[in-house]
Curated annotation (Swiss-Prot):
Keyword ATP-binding: yes
Gene Ontology terms describing biological process: lipid A biosynthetic process; lipopolysaccharide core region biosynthetic process
Highest taxon listed in the record's lineage: Bacteria
Protein name, per record: Tetraacyldisaccharide 4'-kinase
Binding site for ATP: I61, V62, G63, G64, S65, G66, K67, T68
Amino acid sequence: MKQKIHLWIEEYLFFPKFFQKIISFLLLPLTLIYLIIIFTKRFKAKKIDFDIPIISIGNIIVGGSGKTPITIELASKYENACVILRGYGRSSKGLQIVSLNGDIKVDVTVSGDEAMLLAKSLKKATIIVSENRIEAILKAKELGSKIIFLDDGFSKYSISKFDILLKPKNEPTNNFCLPSGGYREPKSFYKKANIVLQEGKDFKRVITIKKDENIKELPSYTILLTAISKPKRLLEFLPKNIKMISFPDHHNFTKEEILDIQNEYKDYAILTTGKDMVKLKEFNLENLYLMDLSIKIDENVDFSSMNSYINSFK
């Protein structure tokens, strides 16, 4: 039931059917209030310069658009890099140092799934989770970081930064902002970014199936188990006979849920994403496969403005 509700909300926000469009229009007065709040915050914000290059990687629609793999791809190119994110789905509060120069300090319950995936992928970087991005930036500088990558930082108007916005390959047919649609900020705000990268044009996802770090072929009977935003986007990379079991974004799997899935799909292998794998490892599942996602950025993408921004701090 939860899975059906989750998928219905996703459909309503991005690709609504007739009845869902009616709901969308009925909620427009609330959307207007939401927009007034957004514009007021942006107008009142006073930029703070932290004297360190800060690259924000974000999007203006609800849910995932490849921020984590793009962050990994870009941050891996720099020494003394720090990635700062809120840490959705974690049990902890406040600022937590997830990894320090590649040395992982906490477990996934403290860090959240995205932060742990970043920590495991960026072997020399520092990863910090915090609700307060300004506090985290100051901590990163204190720890000796020379460049900061800010996850989902576009709406942090008070931070002076270089903004990269990601566009989905298939843009929503519903162009309204919340709660009438899936945009967190007006679509026109793409023009306010320093660089806009669109999936399918400027970058593409590369999928590799692995088991125990080795490249493998998927068994004939496989289910996709995931707790990411917009899970249907994964299906285009997989055989059509794959069944999908999805949970809300950042969901923490329980032992009971895993046992129920194993009982229902006794002869099936389980395929999952890197973000989910950091949470599923604790269950020691024998027939667990990884849908390893990496990003290939088109060689024609122009990063000269970002390089100039970074060099201006040297």
